[in-house]
Amino acid sequence: SAGIVKKAGFTGVQIHGAHGYLVSQFLSPLHNQRNDRWGGSIENRMRFVMEIYRAIRKEVGPEFPVGIKLNSADFLKGGFSEDDAAEVVTALASEGIDLVEISGGTYEAPAMTGNRMAKSGEEAYFMGFARKIRKTVNVPLVVTGGFRTSDAMAAAMEGGEIDMVGLGRPIVVDPDLPNKILSGQPY
């Protein structure tokens, strides 16, 4: 499908490795109970996403951007942890992934919709993990989840903690939001 996307004129493709979908299930020790080469250790559990990435890269070539949306953690007891996520990001970075979008949670434990700001004291939910991973890999980072003001978005980018801000729900509510922010309107 990545080859079809490229032929159709899209400018990149993203693997959805978050929120409890199939790739995320392979990565999670809670959901992945396999006892073969696809389960157990983080090396085995990430084999699925690594093979997907390699197949996509082979299909689209080195110049076509390939990214991944990945949980920083799934926030389930015995599930995918920040340490697991750091290993996956490091492995993908070593293979040439072009972008990592950091999110978190599953539909069982929806951190991407909860009020983590009150706990962390900061607006965006996953900035702590972004800071941690920024120190170990040189890959463009996106954080999605919890940004509610243009000041927080600007501070995260100007501080070099992330390279892009991911917006989902705010743009559904106001499709012209990016233009408003760029024109200096408060958000």
Task: Label the model's feature ranges.
Residues 1-187:
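Flavin-dependent oxidoreductase catalytic cores
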